[in-house]
Amino acid sequence: MARQIAHPASICAWNTDMYGVDATKPGAQEYYDSIIELYASWGVDFIKVDDICVKYGQAGNENTIQYGGDEIELLHNAILHSGREIVLSLSPGPAMLEQAEHLRANANMWRITNDLWDSWGNIMEMFGRCDSWSPYVSEGCYPDCDMIPIGHLSIRGCEHGLSERWTRLTKAEQRTLFSLWCIFRSPLMLGCELTDVDEWTMSLLTNDAVLGLTKHSHGAHQVLRTFDFIVWQAEGEHGEQYVAMFNIAGWPDTFSVSTEKLGLEGAWEVTDLWTGEKEGTIDRTLTAAVETHGVKLVCLKKA
């Protein structure tokens, strides 16, 4: 069966004993139906499929990049046929923006970046990617910013010549990453060793106010971007506004954004989501001192 439906030119570039399925072959759908039926019988709730969101080096040409749309549809149909609700996650990235509607129709999560690691350069790239993909975030459809590289990493790995280590991101950069992922509503997947999570890392992972953005906000979008400053905004379930002010410069600085730019009128009470501190009321301008590569993440409620 596998030999009959395999696509001889669809070979995983980094694991060449893996072949894709030719969706035009008789039995292709039935093959995936049988696989997903088995997983469903085991009670599986989440399936991640690699070498499909984008497929590198197809047909022996290392420079080709293709979209695995036909196989994605086979998987989507197989999940429907199984009768079980199963989350379908696709990688690697970056996903093709022109395939956004097809992805939304056939998957729940799809990677919008290459493998993301603990470097500020990787985090910087995500601001642009999140801006491009923000219109396509909706319930059940989540562009995926990739794993969160905090804590103890690469215990048995050697990615790009880097072996076991604690994250190279500063504490400010870790908060920036977590704030962007949460306001954008990316899936949150940890890339660290869970048995030795330190107190700082645990404080990031257990901040209910910040995590709540993934469930209780919508409409996240980039409000403005300059050479040293980025602002994101989202709306809460009861009209509250969430604002993230990111310092992307190499030095600490003070930034301001007007309530007019945020589309707000009147007075608003300010609460810092990371500290929980109430910081008074604003009516014209939100101003914050932000450390290097750091973030000011606040909730605004009508006063």
Model-derived segments and their meaning:
Residues 47-49, 54-57, 90, 245:
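Conserved beta-strand positions
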Residues 175, 181-184, 189-191, 225-264:
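Carbohydrate-binding surface patches
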Residues 1-42, 46:
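Active-site-adjacent "subsite" loops/lids of carbohydrate-active enzymes
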Residues 4, 8, 24, 34, ...:
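Glycan-recognition surfaces
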Residues 260-276:
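Solvent-exposed beta-hairpin/edge-strand motifs
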Residues 42-47, 82-87, 239-240:
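Loop/turn elements at helix/coil->beta-strand transitions in domains of secreted/extracellular proteins
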Residues 176-224:
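Catalytic cores of secreted or luminal carbohydrate-active enzymes
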Residues 281-303:
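C-terminal beta-strand-rich structural cap/linker in extracellular carbohydrate-active enzymes
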